[in-house]
Amino acid sequence: MASSEETPRSLAGKVALVTGAGRGIGKGIALELAKRGASLVVNYNSAEKPAQEVVDEISKTGSRAVAIKADITKVPEVSRLFQEALRHFGHLDIVVSNSGTEVFKPEEEVTEEDYDRVFNLNTRAQFFIAQHAYVHLRDGGRIVLMSSVAANMSGIPNHALYAGSKAAVEGFTRSFAVDAGHRKITVNAIAPGGVKTDMYDANAWHYVPNGKPGMPMEEIDKGLAAFCPLGRVAVPQDIGRVVAFLAHPDSEWVNGQVILLTGGSVT
């Protein structure tokens, strides 16, 4: 990953809410927004300690943060999350819907419980996060939803459930952008490829030609980096930097878009 100069505090005075911000991509997004001066609502579902560690790390950047527990698959919990965020900071400017789960399973083995678990978090929750964001954001705010490169990939076996759950989010994004435009709120989605997180550690072998369970991580990284012109796989900071741009006033003319974040990888 390229080094950078000290980051200007270009989001000073803004308040951002990031779901699933206690680890992985969500943590990377929260830290990049905080480096630029935004105050952060760090949402988590069950892992309080990692979320509080993110809050502590944000505090070291000079920005403010609070961790708020909420199960975003439950709409009353989504409502409470936004109300607590507003009570703490007074307003909201940026909402990033990051939480998600991935599953690989043969189509004939997918159960109703599998379907509900994946779509409740990856799809339904994102709809209601965006809905509440629209209601509570200040005019000129930013909504960023989470799709995946998988939504438009072909040739990945046993991935229909996950791919479908993310493809729906891309439809949400284009429609929400139209609905929110009169308030100058932009709505975009990002679609990352493989990013070095715990989800990557568990599932990335599926994307490697001839990949197998238990494959050494070094081989997985090498196999996926071979598809990327930049010669590496992504880390959460890469995704966070793009979200930080989408959160900035300079990004206003980027609206209703799904931004592929693969480093130019061809798979």
From Swiss-Prot:
Pfam families given in the database record: adh_short_C2
Q: Superkingdom of this entry's organism? A: Eukaryota
List the EC numbers from the record: 1.1.-.-
Annotated GO molecular function terms are: oxidoreductase activity
- Keyword NADP on this protein? yes
The record's InterPro entries line, in alphabetical order, gives: NAD(P)-bd_dom_sf (IPR036291), Sc_DH/Rdtase_CS (IPR020904), SDR_fam (IPR002347)
Residue positions of the active site: 147-148, 162, 166
The residues listed in the UniProt record as binding NADP(+), with positions renumbered to this chain, are 25, 45, 71, 98, 162, 166, 195, 197
PROSITE patterns found in the cross-reference section: ADH_SHORT
Q: Which SMART domains match?
A: PKS_KR
What are the record keywords, sorted?
A: NADP, Oxidoreductase
User: Which SUPFAM superfamilies does the UniProt entry name for this protein?
Assistant: NAD(P)-binding Rossmann-fold domains (SSF51735)
* The family this protein is said to belong to: Belongs to the short-chain dehydrogenases/reductases (SDR) family.
Q: What does this protein do?
A: Hydroxynaphthalene reductase-like protein; part of the Pks2 gene cluster that mediates the formation of infectious structures (appressoria), enabling these fungi to kill insects faster. The product of the Pks2 gene cluster is different from the one of Pks1 and has still not been identified.
Q: What name appears for this protein in its UniProt entry?
A: Hydroxynaphthalene reductase-like protein Arp2
Gene name in the database record: Arp2
